[in-house]
Amino acid sequence: MDLKDYKNVVVFAEQREGNIQSVAYELLGKARDLADTLGEKVVAMLLGCGIKDQAQKLIEFGADEVIVADCPELKDYLSEQYTQVVDQIVKERCPNIVLYGATTIGRDMAPRIAARLKTGLTADCTKLEVVSDEKSNGEPQFRMTRPAFGGNLMATIICPNTRPQMSTVRPGVMQKRQREEGRQGVVTMFVPKFDTSKFHVKLVETIKEDKAVVDIADAKILVSGGRGVQNKEGFDKLQALADVIGGVVSSSRAMVDNGVMPHDRQVGQTGKTVRPNLYMACGISGAIQHLAGMEESDFIIAINKDKFAPIFSVADLGIVGDLHKIVPMLTERLKKEMEK
């Protein structure tokens, strides 16, 4: 096939226990933008057991067609079963672009699909776009951008010689479209052909992690600390501020690597992407990999001793000074204001 014969933008719509994950709707929003630019359609792949009724939601969030594989073998995610089905669908449909969430499932499955199709895969993308310019000789070109070299620069990657072009995108990076209730689309049932001789793994039990704390990706207010916070005592100051304003404490990679904060509180390319209403960056210099995880916040306040810190380039309000003095003062002032 000629590369121009590959059409449409396909999204793997991840579901767990019959519930479509938010990242699927986020990817549909971006897929809709890409497809409209290319003059192509958006197709969602929905795999599971007893999930056919969920297809309409995907249409209402931007899909033109939903391909549903609904059978007992797909009740729980197992690498080989899901990979076989997605591989069959992609080979049958020959899409131009395929998008996956950079979740535990997406990160496990997408490389397997890429290897079977002998195509490329760009992981953990922060930006996806179709551009026509001199570099592409005026032809529409799909470009995938992600942090590289430890987050010290942003790399824009193309896949010029093979199809489909594939990317994984972390939850929270892209924005959902407004749901269009009643939107019309096509639901196509797909009957997979399994090679059971390759089913070498059996799911014995699923043990869910007990998460007693709020997921930072869901928080409306985040008070985030970096290397400048220094230690646990420094984070206690941030926690006091967060308690006053109804926020959640998060951190940069440096403080996770130092063992001061747990990984589930990390913001950035190797942590979580967040979009709170308010993001307070305290003692965070602003490495590219951190900015990639928080720059879409509605309002950003940065506190840093270094007036040249990169974090100020994305901040709506910047305070140059010692956070260990500023944060306690701010906390006390806010307490007094709230007591009035």
What annotation goes with each model-predicted range?
Residues 1-340:
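N-terminal glycine-rich FAD/FM-binding segment characteristic of electron-transfer flavoproteins
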